[in-house]
């Protein structure tokens, strides 16, 4: 073992920390250390928040009345942005999307909220008896008629592999695919999964049962 001369040993001792009593952890150092920890925590929280909103989930305020009475203007929903990318969309999903070029958009580009009616590859027709998917009549218990009837001008669509047909539940007061055509799935922000405000209407949002006639 190689030793150091006494004076060299004292010099090394002082360079690499020395006696803790000789270098006390002052209140100023504690304060600086605490501020650094707080800044790191805030930075990580901000990054996590933006990553969460960008890729996983995002709150959304319902602005339009086209989904009455399922959703009222002013209600808040949580939008799942991740699972649709993994599993795709299902009939009855309530989706939030940015209007494609063929749709009108507001000056502030407010997203739309609608219900998925037609899925990629399907033939959807509407008429006096309602909506038909590949010839099978769709039972829609959520449709709000606002005291009127649901007489539709006959139309039909054959959806491409990346298209969705979306309607509002308030059929007499909804600007949707009936007027502007299908939307590409790429414009969809995500699927509404929870209504969290107002508290007395808090609920999970799940696709309605359509029975066995329509897959």
Residue ranges and their predicted role:
Residues 2-40, 51, 55-61, 68-215:
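Soluble "head" domains of membrane/secretory-pathway proteins
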């Amino acid at each position: 073992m190689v030793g150091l001369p006494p004076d060299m040993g004292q010099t090394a001792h002082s360079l690499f920390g020395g006696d803790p009593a000789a270098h006390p952890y002052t209140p100023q150092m504690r304060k600086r250390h605490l501020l650094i920890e707080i800044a790191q925590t805030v930075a990580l929280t901000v990054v996590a928040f933006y990553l969460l909103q960008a890729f996983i989930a995002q709150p959304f305020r319902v602005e339009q009345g086209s989904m009455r009475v399922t959703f009222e203007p002013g209600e808040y929903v949580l939008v799942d942005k991740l699972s649709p990318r993994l599993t795709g969309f299902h009939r009855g999903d309530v989706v939030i999307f940015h209007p494609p070029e063929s749709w009108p958009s507001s000056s502030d580009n407010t997203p739309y909220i609608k219900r998925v009616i037609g899925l990629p590859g399907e033939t959807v027709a509407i008429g006096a008896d309602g909506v038909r998917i590949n010839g099978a009549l769709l039972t829609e218990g959520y449709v709000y008629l606002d005291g009127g009837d649901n007489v539709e001008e006959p139309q039909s669509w054959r959806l491409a592999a990346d298209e969705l047909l979306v309607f509002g539940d308030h059929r007499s007061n909804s600007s949707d695919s009936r007027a502007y055509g299908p939307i590409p799935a790429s414009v969809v922000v995500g699927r509404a999964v929870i209504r969290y405000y107002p508290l007395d209407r808090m609920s999970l949002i799940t696709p309605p049962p359509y029975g066995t006639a329509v897959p």
